Amino acid sequence: MKSDKKKIYLFIAVVVIVGILTTLSSFALWTVASNNINVAVNTFPPLEGNIRYTEGHSILAGDLPLCLNYFDGINTTFTIGKESNLSEHLVYASMHLKTNDDSYLAYADAINWQIRTASSASPLASGTLADFAVGSNIMLDNIEVTTTDTSYTFYIWVDSTYGDANALAGLTIDLELWMEVRYERYNVRPVVNEGLIPVVFDTTSGTVVKTIGKNDGDWYNYDKQKWANAVLVTESSRSTYLNTSGVTVSESDILGYFVWIPRYRYKIWTTGVSSSGNEQEIDIIFEGKNETKAVATQAGGYYTHPAFTFGGTQLDGFWIGKFETSGPASLPKVKPDIKALVSQNISTQFATALKFAGGTQSGSTVTFDGNSTYGLTSKTDSHMLKNSEWGAVAYLSHSKYGANREVYINNSSGLYTGRSGGNVSGSTPINGTYTDQTSTTQYNSYGFYTWDGYLLNYNTNTRSSTRNLNKVASTTGNIYGVYDMSGGAYEYVMGNFANTIGNSGFTTLPDSKYYDVYSSDVFTGTSTTNINFCTLATCGGHALNETAGWYSDSSRFVYSSSAWFRRGGYYNGSASGIFYFYYDSGTNVANFSFRTCLSDA
């Protein structure tokens, strides 16, 4: 059919909005008037007045011919740049599209869109409306805003090769197109719960833990794999460290180390089951809890990680224990160089994690009264790590903000926290590190390296003078990451099949926000086949199907007889790793530990 013989009439309502969302608790809205009806530029500090923006037309209406090429479609162009005083800061703009009616659904695969710049030989992003559900917000593209103004044009048209063109005559489509602009540093700003003390590590001579102000720019830099760290200290020493900077924190005063995992969206690379050999850098964009959630459903779109939705609360991030939880159970800690707390069933592990913030469980209800021992108040929720929260850390680790490779293994058979074999699982023979030894065994009681990179004297718990910080087994490959996520003890997480209590010890499962559930209505197979039923809605971000088999880590799903997930693998397993997952019953086992997480209550 020739395009001049048949025209399709589309009404496209395109609302272009620029919104800058940060983790600041309060802000004033700044609106720039537009020459075009219904177009405004909305922003918040610190970008107020520092973003240059020229709007496209708010209303596009007209005859849209059937065509083969984008340039015959209808379009809108907008231009964006930043002022020179932001030249040292990363600013990103994401383009979003939302459909407001369902009239197009039967023909969605015929309606094409593209985003281009004047200089681009190929589109920056493209697709069809088949990727959209009514009312869903789809991120079309994410671009860095530079000091050079750049124009972007959005095109939409009907494919002339579509078989049933007559059915499209007179079709009206209501779409919204807008932008969100983010100042990256503000989107990773940690929420410092009362009792937490921001720290950095001075490794110039030994390892010295020092306090730092929460607004100090040297506290963290995720662009350089320097994740924000904080500690909990004893009640008697707390006043020495609170609200200080540069004060050395005595190791004996520290009760727990925690690492901030900031809220983000990630780019979907598969909706199926991955496998070994398909490892790739995970594309992550930090976001604030007040930003519109990304809810793409297809590869190439962005999806807000589910770990940052805690029940009905949107989180800017959470604090994860830097190490596996250690004992005693009556006074749990999160520290290096201590044996992990093991031999607890899942219900006891859950109750132990609650102790940090004075939590108790009654029936399914969990309440917090605070705990002066750790300095946490009732405004903090301390809980056992969920499966999705494990996934959030794993994905951040495998992005440009983390090690972006296989995490080294903790090869301590004594289950000492923070230890390292100096390499990945299956690649840590004793004679490869200790050249005066002949054994090819992959582990020993204490591991080979400490959390701060010191080589241990062979098969002892004493440090040598040899140090290599590149040998540490953290999610960043340096001292600022999370440890013990490959090897060490197995770690139970709160991930459960069909609300099955099993051998966990629970009488009643806690509130559903404390665990991820994998429904028997969906997962109807076995430990080896259930992964095939994963979808973005059920498993997205959990480091299950999306990363299955990465680095040959074991992949076995929960099912009716073994209803609880364990993660990370064991000190001696070649299939251990941050993407390892396996089923278990939830019972107490002598080599199973767990992880503690802190978030807003």
Which residue stretches match the model-derived regions?
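A solvent-exposed, charged loop/short amphipathic helix patch at secondary-structure junctions
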Residues: 325-351, 503-532
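Extracellular adhesion/glycan-binding regions together with long Ser/Thr-
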Residues: 2-6, 61-70, 121-151, 155-159
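Short aromatic-cysteine micro-motif
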Residues: 248, 252-255, 287-485, 600
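Surface-exposed interaction patch
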Residues: 22, 31, 68-126
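C-terminal, surface-exposed recognition/capping segments
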Residues: 388-391, 412-446, 451-452, 456-462, ...
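C-terminal, structured domain-capping segment
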Residues: 72-91, 96, 139-186
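Short, polar/proline-rich extracytoplasmic segments that appear immediately after membrane translocation
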Residues: 2-69, 169-175, 180-186
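N-terminal module-boundary/linker segments of secreted carbohydrate-active enzymes
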Residues: 187-301
